[in-house]
């Protein structure tokens, strides 16, 4: 099973991706995680990527395809995989097709923008462990402190409202074209991904069940 998981920043893609990965025993390929690891390395390319993300822009198609191509060649992807964060553009989708990557399902987790903004701007992170909290939905026991270590929590630099609105604008502009691309795929290809739109405003387990009901 090969799945593309779509959803705006803050839609809960990461949570659903982990649940899908465990249920179907497929590899979860998160470009976001791979990009963050590159930034942590403090290399020159990592510094450039940080500037791009801080400005609310998307990483180049060339870089994304390069890291995805390398990742899907690994043995753990032979049983299938879930792409989280790619493709985001028509160019990326076309490049995946050129690589012979046949997709079975396109799953979009749809959440209203006002809720996404609330989710993201209230997010707080413990840098060392990656533990994530939320000022409203999942607050720490002590405000601004990690529950386990007591260390300070931070707000990611790209989690401010202006940057979030810019990211959402870019996401919507590109995703609508991407969905049209895959819908039109049927005119020239016998194997067409099934497009599934899921209401992401629901509880996590309800979102998961709705996805499972469609992945048959």
From Swiss-Prot:
PANTHER family: NUCLEOTIDE KINASE
Name of the protein: Adenylate kinase
Catalysed transformations (reactions): AMP + ATP = 2 ADP
Note on domains (UniProt): Consists of three domains, a large central CORE domain and two small peripheral domains, NMPbind and LID, which undergo movements during catalysis. The LID domain closes over the site of phosphoryl transfer upon ATP binding. Assembling and dissambling the active center during each catalytic cycle provides an effective means to prevent ATP hydrolysis.
Segments of this protein annotated with the region NMP: 30-59
BP GO terms, sorted: AMP salvage
Enzyme Commission numbers on file: 2.7.4.3
Residues binding AMP: 31, 36, 57-59, 92, 156, 167
Segments of this protein annotated with the region LID: 122-159
Chain residues that bind ATP: 10-15, 123, 132-133, 202
Subcellular location: Cytoplasm
GO terms for MF: adenylate kinase activity; ATP binding
Enzyme type, top EC level: transferase
DNA-binding listed as a keyword: no
Function: Catalyzes the reversible transfer of the terminal phosphate group between ATP and AMP. Plays an important role in cellular energy homeostasis and in adenine nucleotide metabolism.
Pathway membership: Purine metabolism; AMP biosynthesis via salvage pathway; AMP from ADP: step 1/1
Gene Ontology CC, one term: cytoplasm
Highest taxon of the lineage: Bacteria
Record keyword Glycoprotein present: no
Key words of the record: ATP-binding, Cytoplasm, Kinase, Nucleotide biosynthesis, Nucleotide-binding, Transferase
Family recorded in the similarity comment: Belongs to the adenylate kinase family.
Pfam family, one: ADK_lid
